[in-house]
Every structure is written in structure tokens, then in C-alpha cells.
Amino acid sequence: MKVGGFQPVRGTKDLLSEEYYKLFHIQNVAQEIGERFGFMPVQTPIFEFQEVFCKTLGDSTDVIGKEMYTFADRGGDVLALRPEFTAAIVRLLLSEKMQPPARLFTAGPVFRYERPQKCRQRQFHQINYECFGAGGSQADAEIISLAYCVLEVFGLHCDVTLEINSLGSSECMNAYRASLLSFFEKYRSELSEDSRRRLQTNPLRILDSKDATDKEILSTAPSIEDFYDAETRASFEGLKDHLTNLGIPYAVNRRLVRGLDYYTGTVFEYKTSSLGAQDAIIAGGRYDNLVAAMGGENVPAIGFAGGVERLAALMSYSRTRKFCVFILPISEEVVSHAMRITYEIRRTLSGVQVICDIVTRLKTGIKRADRQKADIALILGDEEVNRNAVSCKNMLTGKQEEISISNITEYLKAMMAERQ
């Protein structure tokens, strides 16, 4: 552990004001869009019992095998920082005894021990939507359209490609898994180390390999489409029809699988070519067996997550700047008067930033106001106090005038109206 220099832990970063505003703008807008679709906000703890994730994500996944942050507390419980939201939201659904149908939105930080790179840190933020109690292709299309709406609002829908696939029913997946196992056994010695490990645990995960040799082998691998039953085939055709009807362009990718083992049926990803290897910015799918696997009843469910930092890297955002008032008491004797004026403006005017800075030289105070990009500087000295007034300097035009303290709020309202 390197402490010298007091830098952030590798894979984490500080958020300065502009980036903070951008990330939380994304989360706030995402929540508002979710509410249009009937999703209500909830929040789960940052850490859960480790079993919440180990029981659901799959032992063969990188998240469980290599990436999860775990620790034992003083009571002996083994806990984990959440590596994703879905399992935690299912736990919430069950522990709070929510009855489906339920549509839940959440957002916040998640944690994975990965190799840090562009748009891939060990602490990052996600927006997350989970829909419980809705099955069928119509529900799938609605969730995919919600994701499209998020991208559209942020101006990114033209810069992404939607890829869809179906993993089919449990019977389809079992038959396909057996076929893949037989196929990959012929290439065992050529597969990457990760893929050889996945061959023993879940050969479907090899389809997600980024290794060049693995990709070449995959080019002749069996397609899951060959193992669809009639119901799966009809459902997937229905999904394509719904997306076409909604005007949402898509591409079928028969190699598309998700990185967690709980997925069944429809899976999808919105991808971009603008972020290098981290091409998925929104991804999700159906997980009809997960609620039952965690001790609940059989409940159809579908959802998705979006990477907030990845969305932020692609979109432009300019925060609306608050009208800034810089109050300059230029002697200790008038500080109490300046504090009263500052408090009154903050109390009565919304959408305004008020800074009170004690200075001994007016020139220094004006420079500070200029650095702060203040709209108005209110100058208060002994003479102004004696006249029960304040000198108002327009930082844009340089014009300066004296205003009665009793009229200062109305004066600032008028100035704010001019700037709009």
C-alpha cells in the first residue's frame, strides 16, 4: 500500500466540481426519464452480504472470481462492496416484501477490482432500471426503448449501435452449452487461459472473449439460434417487430452474451466505437430465474444498467451558471452589516450564489470577484453603512451605482432578469 503523497487509491478518482455536476446531472435526468416509464427510485446499501452476489452472479464470472471487493466485519460476517445493482435490488424486493409488478430505479457507485483504463475504474457509477413481473417481447421492447430514450435525451442515440440476442429458455441454454463444450474441447490447447477456465464452468462465457485467437475459433462455433425452441423463436421475432414498430434500429448478434450468469432470454447492449475497448455504454437483459434463485417466487424480470462515466465521456454538458453576487466589506467594522445583507439575499433569492469576502483593499476584492466570475460586486464600507446603502458594481459593464440596502433584493432580481 502506497500512502506517500496521499493520492487516491488506484482505480479511484476525485470528482471536481464540473465533473461532479455532470455525473449527477446524468443520474438526475436518468431518474426523471425512468419516472416517465413508471420507475420509482430506491437505494440499496453500498455493501451487502457476500452471498447476495455469490449466489446470483455465477462462480464462473470474472466479477465473482477476480473482481469483487470483500471483507469480514467485526461480527464475523463476510460482506462485499456491490459490484452491480441487480442482485441487490432483488434482495431489496424480497426483504421489503414488494409485490410485483414493480419498476425500480437506482443509481450510485459500484466497485470492481479491474485493471484501470479509460472509462473503466475500480469505483464507478451506474444508472440502473429493474422491471419485475412483466414477461414477453413487449416488455423486452419497452425496456430497450427506455434505454434508447436515455441515450436520445443525452444526444447519443445516433452514435451507438443496439445489438440484441436471445439466450433462449433454460432447455435451449443447456443444449447449447453442451454443444459448445463439445466444440471447444477440440480447441482446448489453443484457447486462452481464461477460456480454458470458462470451459469447465460456463462455456457460454467464452463467446464474450476478447482474445484474438479465441475470436478466430469462435467464427466457426455453433450458433445459439440452432437450439431455439418454437416459443423462444416466436418471442425473439416479436421483439424485432416491436423495435421496428418503435423506430429503434438494431442488429442481431448471435455471439452476444452478458457477463453475469443470471441472464436468460433477451440480452442487449448499446455500443459505441468512441471509447476503445469499453464499447458497451448500456447493457442488460432478462433474468427470469433470479428472484426464485434468491428465495422468492418465479417472477419474470428484465433490466439494464448504464455506465455514468461512459455516458459522460460521450456527451457535452454545460451547467447553467448561477447568478453570482460577491459582497465586499472593506473594513472589519462593517462585517456584521455585510453578514446581514448576505444572509438576507441567500434567504430570499433562489438561483443565486452569494459569497462574502472580507478584504482590506477594494482592488484585491474586485480581482477576487472577477476570478469568481461574479455578476455583481456589492461594496460595503463605512460611508455606505452610514448612508444605509451599498455600492453595486456591474462586473460585466463596470458601471457602479449606490442602492439603498432596503432595495437591494429588488435590485438584484431586476439584474437577474436582465441576464436571463
UniProtKB/Swiss-Prot annotation:
Protein family according to the UniProt entry: Belongs to the class-II aminoacyl-tRNA synthetase family.
Keyword Translocase: no
A Pfam short name: HGTP_anticodon
Entry keyword annotation includes Ligase: yes
Gene3D superfamilies cross-referenced by the UniProt entry: Anticodon-binding domain, Bira Bifunctional Protein, Domain 2
EC number: 6.1.1.21
Domain of life (superkingdom): Bacteria
Quaternary state and interactors: Homodimer.
Name of the protein described by the UniProt record: Histidine--tRNA ligase
Reaction(s) the record says it catalyses: tRNA(His) + L-histidine + ATP = L-histidyl-tRNA(His) + AMP + diphosphate + H(+)
GO cellular component, one term: cytoplasm
Main location: cytoplasm
